[in-house]
Amino acid sequence: MDPAFHEALASGIEALGLPVDEAARALLERYADRLLAWNRKVNLTAITAPAELAEKHLVDSLVLLPVLSGARTLLDVGSGAGLPGMPLACARRDLSVTCCDGVAKKIAFVKAVSAELDLPVRGVAVRAEGDPEREGLPRADAVVSRALADPDRWVPVGARYLAEGGTLLAMLGREVDRAALEAVGAAEGLTLVGLDVYELPISRAARAVARWQRR
C-alpha cells in the first residue's frame, strides 16, 4: 500500500486518540487493499486515493470505537463496502458485526473479505426497512448507518433494530441542530444521550456522531 496511506491512517488514529493496535492496523491495510482491488470490477467507492481512503473511510469509521466500548453486537445498515462495520471489526475482534445492504455485489465483497481476513462479520443482502424478523436481521447493542445521514429518515428505521439497552448511532457530516436531534429521537421513544463533534485531522472535514438510547 502507498506510504501516504500509512501516514494518513497513523496520523488520524493518533490525532483522535483511537485505540487501534498494530495487529488491527495490519488488518485495516489488508481490508483497504481488497477494497481497491474489488473496486476495479465492482463499484464500491468513489474514493480511491490511498490517503483519502485511509482518512474518510477508515479513520472516519474508527471514531466510533470509544462509544462502542460496552457493545458486543453491531448492526451496520446500508453498509455498502462494509463501512463502518468492517474497519470496526478489524479493531474489535470481540465485536460481532452484521453488515446489511440491498446491493448483492457489495455484500459479496463483505462476505469474501471478512472470510479472508477472519473477521467477526456477517453480510446480509437485504434492504433494511424496519422489520428485522422478516429481513433476517438481528437486534443489536449498537445500530449505525453511514448511508442514511438524515436523522429524520434514519432514526425511525434504526430504532427498530435496537436490543434492550442498545444505542442508536447517526454519523453526520454537516452542521447539526441538537434540538432537532432530541425531537426526532423523542418521537421514537429515544433520548439523545450524546453528540460528539470532531474534525477529520487531514481534510478538516466536519463530522458529528449522535447517540440515542430508549427511555
UniProtKB/Swiss-Prot annotation:
Top-level taxonomic group: Bacteria
GO CC term, one of those recorded: cytosol
EC number annotated for this UniProt entry: 2.1.1.170
Principal subcellular localization: cytoplasm
Stored Pfam families: GidB
Top enzyme class: transferase
UniProt entry keywords in alphabetical sequence: Cytoplasm, Methyltransferase, rRNA processing, S-adenosyl-L-methionine, Transferase
InterPro entries to which the protein is assigned, alphabetical: rRNA_ssu_MeTfrase_G (IPR003682), SAM-dependent_MTases_sf (IPR029063)
Binding sites annotated in the UniProt record for S-adenosyl-L-methionine: 78, 83, 128-129, 146
Gene Ontology molecular function: any one: rRNA (guanine-N7-)-methyltransferase activity
NCBIfam families hit by this protein: rsmG_gidB
Similarity field: Belongs to the methyltransferase superfamily. RNA methyltransferase RsmG family.
General function of this protein: Specifically methylates the N7 position of guanine in position 527 of 16S rRNA.
Entry protein name: Ribosomal RNA small subunit methyltransferase G
Species this protein is from: Anaeromyxobacter sp. (strain K)
